[in-house]
């Protein structure tokens, strides 16, 4: 090989190596690994696959620092964690009813009820923690840039069967759980965008990919979600008055931070009455 050929080969190898390095660091393949943009893309991909646990992990990595995605990731995290808490509560409530209906074998239903409530509590606590961080920001309007969730808002048939005390086969149970959780996430998103129990409206609102919601409306929606999530800790369920009070207090504080409306006034009255009732136990 001539000296010129050797130099040419060396330069070619250097160019290839440089290209590979650029490709692995981002380039045409997408955002560089470890950046907020990388985790934002990952959150979208895992959300589309209904891997909600991984989606939350990606969002938590984003919200760990202040960056261009933080505000959007935090509101998505609120919608997602509140929705999952709702989904697991629905599962727990259905199996609790099943334990009462199935007198010959209530133990299995009670175990499921307990396990679902443990999961509901985990996501409820993640929700209230994320909300505390959100309240430190003063974004107005609030950015909502998450994709419209897949799934259906229709009641899951298998839950009706479980509520009646019918034992679900494993082939029925796992798909039913996924549908219930997807439904919870869908309804959580509807609540966040101000389209409670109205998926078509929520889908239309989220179509732009960069919805801006007045802070008053979003905080009011979160107050509702906080109060709903707190029901997990009432005397009929987990029976933890301290945690119940935390959720109710957060909801009341949220309502105090926005201008009073007929909706906020009614919700404040409802929460206050609920707290007084709890104090009697």
In which residue ranges do the predicted regions lie?
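Bacterial N-terminal signal peptides that target proteins for export
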Residues: 1-14
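C-terminal motif of bacterial Sec signal peptides marking the signal peptidase cleavage site
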Residues: 21-24
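Bacterial signal peptide processing site
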Residues: 26-29
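Alpha-helical segment of the N-proximal tetratricopeptide repeat
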Residues: 35-61
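TPR-repeat structural position
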Residues: 52, 110, 117, 179, ...
């Amino acid at each position: 090989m001539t000296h010129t050929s050797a130099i040419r080969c060396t330069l070619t190898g250097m160019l290839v190596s440089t290209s590979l390095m650029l490709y692995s660091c981002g380039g045409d393949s997408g955002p560089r690994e470890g950046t907020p943009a990388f985790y934002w893309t990952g959150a979208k991909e895992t959300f589309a696959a209904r891997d909600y646990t991984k989606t939350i992990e990606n969002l938590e990595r984003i919200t760990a620092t202040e960056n261009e995605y933080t505000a959007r990731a935090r509101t998505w995290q609120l919608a997602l964690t509140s929705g999952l808490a709702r989904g697991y509560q629905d599962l727990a409530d259905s199996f609790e009813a099943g334990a009462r209906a199935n007198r010959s074998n209530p133990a299995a239903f009670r175990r499921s009820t307990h396990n679902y409530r443990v999961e509901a509590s985990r996501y409820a606590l993640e929700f209230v923690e994320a909300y505390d961080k959100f309240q430190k920001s003063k974004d107005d309007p609030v950015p909502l840039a998450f994709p419209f969730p897949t799934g259906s808002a229709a009641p899951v048939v298998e839950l009706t069967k479980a509520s009646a005390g019918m034992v679900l086969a494993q082939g029925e149970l796992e798909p039913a759980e996924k549908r219930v959780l997807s439904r919870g996430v869908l309804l959580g998103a509807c609540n966040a965008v101000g389209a409670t129990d109205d998926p078509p409206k929520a889908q239309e609102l989220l179509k732009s990919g960069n919805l801006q919601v007045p802070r008053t409306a979003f905080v009011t929606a979160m107050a509702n979600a906080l109060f709903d999530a707190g029901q997990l800790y009432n005397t009929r369920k987990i029976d933890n008055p301290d945690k119940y009070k935390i959720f109710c207090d957060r909801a009341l504080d949220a309502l105090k931070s926005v201008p009073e409306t007929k909706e906020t006034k009614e919700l404040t009255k409802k929460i206050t009455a609920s707290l007084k009732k709890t104090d009697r136990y």
